[in-house]
């Protein structure tokens, strides 16, 4: 079975030699100004947010949150413990943050065009918040080689709606016998709205290959 993972986090490829990691876009760092507002909380929305952030001293003695398991692990590798929601993603994070946010000052580390749900939630419940944009996603200029690679896929894993959009616009050949797997309900709904069937899998399973096989 040929399984293709579109995540830009190449560390996922360690999970199995069966899974081929082929990112559909690149991550480009953006210079930023750090908003030192005596913050009480910092949120990292992605692995790329961690990898392109430079002021980790700010994480000392404050609350650190990560959107999901991969982001938490990336922070842990740097010696930083982060809290994560039971359900990865914005909805789970909002539940974890709760509604008693007055007197708290947040910085959200994210990419250009990243989700604003956590930002809006904090404002709604009286917290102060600044977005810190430290990277952007950039499409490749040509997908001809990837189109040939993906023609051999039995299953494709989408870790973001951005990757899914690029795939269906530049790579997918109609009537291909391939199954689509998504790491969250949000990504699955996006793929379904494009007119394709998809299933949500536990991306952080101990055996991701088995997880994919059971979903097909």
Where are these regions (language model features)?
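Signature of uroporphyrinogen-III synthase
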Residues: 1-216
């Amino acid at each position: 079975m040929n399984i293709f993972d579109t995540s830009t986090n190449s560390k996922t490829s360690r999970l199995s030699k069966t899974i081929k990691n082929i990112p559909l876009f690149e991550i480009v760092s953006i210079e930023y100004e750090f908003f030192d507002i005596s913050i009480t909380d910092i949120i990292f929305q992605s692995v790329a947010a961690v990898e392109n952030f430079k002021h980790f001293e700010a994480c000392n003695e404050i609350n650190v949150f990560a959107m999901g398991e991969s982001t938490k692990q990336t922070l842990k590798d740097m010696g930083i413990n982060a809290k994560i929601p039971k359900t990865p993603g914005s909805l789970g994070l909002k539940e974890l943050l709760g509604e008693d946010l007055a007197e708290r000052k947040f910085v959200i580390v994210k990419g250009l065009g990243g989700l604003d749900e956590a930002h809006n939630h904090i404002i709604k419940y009286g917290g102060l918040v600044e977005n810190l944009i430290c990277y952007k996603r950039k499409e490749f200029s040509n997908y001809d080689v990837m189109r040939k690679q993906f023609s051999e896929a039995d299953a494709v894993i989408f870790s973001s709606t951005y990757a899914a959009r690029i795939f269906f616009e530049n790579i997918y050949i109609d009537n291909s016998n391939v199954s689509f797997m998504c790491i969250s309900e949000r990504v699955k709904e996006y793929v379904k709205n494009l007119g394709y069937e998809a299933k949500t899998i536990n991306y952080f399973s101990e055996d991701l290959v088995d997880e994919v096989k059971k979903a097909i």
